[in-house]
């Protein structure tokens, strides 16, 4: 007659695998050596996403304010009022130096003003123009990027004012230079909000 202990061992070994799987699933997680699994999964599911600060997202930008010079020309400044140079831009010989290649929005505004014409004087037109130019190693001369012109006929009605604003997107290369040329400088109405010039990377 087979001992009782051996019979019990034979029954366990002959138990179908499906039954053993069901028995394992019915055991507590601690008995399976999986304690904390449910807590860890829950914590991961409700954990707020971490914010990663990516360096190098600060893009070049420049804003210049116009001032008159002794040579009757338009002088740009970056260290006064609301003017600035950021993240690679520099001002050299009254020109903006492009720090990196890419797309840039270039803009400029000028405001002209003048007095009315004397009743005895013969009205003559005043030519006003403002242009943003590109100087690059790819071209042997200054290339116009933005250009605007106006003619004013001073009358007897009183002082006159004319404004010009220009802006567009350009593909520029590192080392390119942006400058301006203005006709009618003696009529420029200088202030930080009326005469300015700048660019920023997109």
From Swiss-Prot:
Domain THD span(s) in chain numbering: 60-202
KW Secreted (keyword) present: yes
Spans through the membrane: none
Subcellular location: Secreted; Membrane
Gene Ontology MF annotations: cytokine activity; tumor necrosis factor receptor binding
A Pfam family this chain is assigned to: TNF
Principal cellular location given in the protein's record: secreted
Gene3D superfamilies: 2.60.120.40
Span of the signal peptide: 1-33
Keywords in alphabetical order: Cytokine, Glycoprotein, Membrane, Secreted, Signal
Family: Belongs to the tumor necrosis factor family.
The protein's assembly and partners: Homotrimer, and heterotrimer of either two LTB and one LTA subunits or (less prevalent) two LTA and one LTB subunits. Interacts with TNFRSF14.
Listed name of the protein: Lymphotoxin-alpha
Organism in which the protein naturally occurs: Rattus norvegicus (Rat)
């Amino acid at each position: 007659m087979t001992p009782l202990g051996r019979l019990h061992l034979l029954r366990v070994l002959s138990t179908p695998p499906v039954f053993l799987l069901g028995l394992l699933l019915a055991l507590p997680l601690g008995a399976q050596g999986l304690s904390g699994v449910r807590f860890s999964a829950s914590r991961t599911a409700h954990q707020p996403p971490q914010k990663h600060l990516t360096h190098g997202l600060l893009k070049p930008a420049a804003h210049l304010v116009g001032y008159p010079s002794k040579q009757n020309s338009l002088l740009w400044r970056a260290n006064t009022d609301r003017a600035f140079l950021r993240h690679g831009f520099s001002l050299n010989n009254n020109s903006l130096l492009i720090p990196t290649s890419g797309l840039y929005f270039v803009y400029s505004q000028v405001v002209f003003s003048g007095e009315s014409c004397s009743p005895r004087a013969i009205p003559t037109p005043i030519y006003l123009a403002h242009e943003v130019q590109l100087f690059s190693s790819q071209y042997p001369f200054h290339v116009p990027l933005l250009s605007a012109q106006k003619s004013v006929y001073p009358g007897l009605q009183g002082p006159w004012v004319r404004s010009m604003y220009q802006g567009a997107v350009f593909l520029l290369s590192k080392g390119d230079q942006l400058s301006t040329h203005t006709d009618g400088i003696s009529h420029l109405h200088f202030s930080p909000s009326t005469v300015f010039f700048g660019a920023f990377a997109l």
